[in-house]
UniProtKB/Swiss-Prot annotation:
It comes from Homo sapiens. Residues 109-117 are annotated as: Complementarity-determining-3. Its main location: secreted. Residues 20-44 are annotated as: Framework-1. GO terms for cellular component: blood microparticle; extracellular region; immunoglobulin complex; plasma membrane. This is Immunoglobulin lambda variable 1-47. Keywords: Adaptive immunity, Cell membrane, Disulfide bond, Immunity, Immunoglobulin, Immunoglobulin domain, Membrane, Pyrrolidone carboxylic acid, Secreted, Signal.
Length: 117
């Protein structure tokens, strides 16, 4: 079966008229149906290291949907094929039993303490 891309985008935190990218994701990941794919998100002690991580899925032409909150919790209705984890200043989203409908943009998010005040 042919592989298909899971497109990833950097999350940008905005404040006022400026924006700063503080979390880093790889530009893309791919897999074949049925596989397990892991998407990474790297940060620092001021964001992932000291705050909860959230993951969003954005299908083409739709608004972002919350997949994971508080590092590893799934909202009602999100399949258990999706799981989140965090270790130190990095987080990851795992998708098991990959399906064609999983092709989307995936965003990680975390508050950054350095942007406060």
């Amino acid at each position: 079966m042919a592989g298909f891309p899971l497109l990833l985008t950097l999350l940008t935190h905005c404040a006022g008229s400026w924006a700063q990218s503080v979390l880093t994701q790889p530009p893309s990941a791919s897999g074949t149906p049925g596989q397990r794919v892991t998407i990474s998100c790297s940060g620092s002690s001021s964001n992932i290291g000291s705050n909860y991580v959230y993951w969003y899925q954005q299908l083409p032409g739709t608004a972002p949907k919350l997949l994971i909150y508080s590092n590893n919790q799934r909202p009602s209705g999100v399949p258990d094929r999706f799981s989140g984890s965090k270790s130190g200043t990095s987080a990851s989203l795992a998708i098991s039993g990959l399906r064609s409908e999983d092709e989307a943009d995936y965003y990680c998010a975390a508050w950054d303490d350095s942007l406060s005040g």
